[in-house]
């Protein structure tokens, strides 16, 4: 029994593969006619031309919030104010966890949905319901639970795998593997998770990911070093 509590697993829509950034136009159009894009200068230089083309083809306008720093009240408040003033009907967060978390909170403050585009395979923020926000001095405030998880997540492997330092992918592999002992500990010993179908499913998925990455993680890194992306 969940005592009428809301159950939410992850993004409502998830795409992964080479070239899936082209989906950004049609997915944005499902949410309206104008997007607020939260993205830093480095990522924008790599993606601007394609994003402009894909949004234009779907008749979606956009305004950009030039992100820098961390997921702070200043950043997500400024972003949301710009989005509201410009009449934006959705938010797109592009980059790493800090930019994406900022976009998710800005969307929550605006009362609209968010599309996430991670540029690293070490970015779990793109599908997580919560955001982690910080003070200006870098100290953590805590978790910010938005009303909705991401509407859609686009993991373009041409960007997140092939155009990203390999150390980030290695970090992502280890982070994903750590979920199995973390979830198992909290189910059996820690007492943080209630035992039910949802937590047990999470443990099974985490175990499967752990086993797959233990077996194939090293070979995947070797292939990426050669510029190869395949079913493995």
Language model: regions and residue ranges:
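Alpha-helical scaffold segments in soluble metabolic enzymes
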Residues: 23-27, 50, 78, 82, ...
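A glycine/threonine-rich phosphate-anchoring loop and its flanking beta-alpha core
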Residues: 12, 110-205
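Short, conserved catalytic/metal-binding motifs centered on acidic residues
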Residues: 17, 97, 177
């Amino acid at each position: 029994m969940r005592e009428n509590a809301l159950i939410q697993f992850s993004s409502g829509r998830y795409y992964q593969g080479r070239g899936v950034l082209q989906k950004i136009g049609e997915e944005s159009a499902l949410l309206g006619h104008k997007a607020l894009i939260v993205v830093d200068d480095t990522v924008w230089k790599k993606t601007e031309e394609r994003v402009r083309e894909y949004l234009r083809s779907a008749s979606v306008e956009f305004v950009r919030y030039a992100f820098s720093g961390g997921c702070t009240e200043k950043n997500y408040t400024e972003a949301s104010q710009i989005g509201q003033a410009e009449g934006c009907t959705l938010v797109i967060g592009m980059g790493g966890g800090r930019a994406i978390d900022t976009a998710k909170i800005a969307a929550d403050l605006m009362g609209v949905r968010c599309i996430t585009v991670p540029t690293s395979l070490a970015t779990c923020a793109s599908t997580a319901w919560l955001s982690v926000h910080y003070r200006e001095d870098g100290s953590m405030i805590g978790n910010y639970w938005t009303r909705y998880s991401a509407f859609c997540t686009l993991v373009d492997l041409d960007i997140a795998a092939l155009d990203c330092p390999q150390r980030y992918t290695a970090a992502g592999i280890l982070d994903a593997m750590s979920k199995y002992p973390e979830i198992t500990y909290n189910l059996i010993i820690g007492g943080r998770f209630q035992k039910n179908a949802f937590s047990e499913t999470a443990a099974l998925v985490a175990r499967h990911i752990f086993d797959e990455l233990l077996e194939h993680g090293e070979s995947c890194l070797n292939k990426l070093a050669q510029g190869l992306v395949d079913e493995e």
